[in-house]
UniProtKB/Swiss-Prot annotation:
The lineage of its organism: Bacteria, Pseudomonadati, Pseudomonadota, Betaproteobacteria, Burkholderiales. One of its GO terms (molecular function) is dethiobiotin synthase activity. Homodimer. The active site is at K40. Its EC number is 6.3.3.3. This is ATP-dependent dethiobiotin synthetase BioD. It is found in: Cytoplasm. It comes from Burkholderia multivorans (strain ATCC 17616 / 249). Pfam families: AAA_26 (PF13500). ATP binds at E15, I16, G17, K18, T19, F20, D57, E118, G119, V120, G121, N178, H179. Its cofactor is Mg(2+). GO terms for cellular component: cytosol. Pathway: Cofactor biosynthesis; biotin biosynthesis; biotin from 7,8-diaminononanoate: step 1/2. Its main location: cytoplasm.
Amino acid sequence: MSTPLSLFVTGTDTEIGKTFVSAALLHGFARHGLRAAAMKPVAAGAYERDGVWRNEDADQLDAAASVVLPPELRTPFLLKAPAAPHIVAAHEHVTLDIDTIVACHRDALTRADIVVVEGVGGFRVPLNDTQDTADLAVALGLPVVLVVGMRLGCISHALLTADAIAARGLTLAGWVANHVDPAMTYADENVATIRDWLAREHRAPLLGRIAHMAPADPESAAATLDIAALVDTLRAAQR
């Protein structure tokens, strides 16, 4: 039996399509014949339905996953207010504990062939007074997929984030160009610049370009991603 695969999805910023790309990856992995599950370990922003608190990002991941995890595994920390997690957690008297997330991830790996773990915000978002989401990625020990929101300023954000990932000793398995701004000028040139720099400095391939979609359609977006290459990279990282 093959060892389960997993990856950590981060982004250059918040609101750049991490959940959308994570959902596209889930669809792609399912088409590749893998039982794919998703985790959103920390989610800030909840709504109540039928007496149950839910999160829109987590709902989107569940809709795309071929293996739906129990809510307590998928999102061990669901915060009500849509703001910086460590601030909301303090107000809601919640301790965001990395060890708890690692334990949930270990359980999730027993239920699927691949687990997509979506971070919160950018790569370094505080979880408490001493730890951030980069520490979470290190604790999980996962290869990272970087979602770059293609808009003005994205080149610097992409290069800085890639450097931060490498500085933590993590593998940048690849990146996705997500065109969040349909009016962006020189989009092709921006993608080419990021592609060349990340390939040269981090050997990180461009996994795909996703055109601006309104409404977002992760199932269609999955067709633009090089899932086979990503799976090969993830398997190589296990050796």
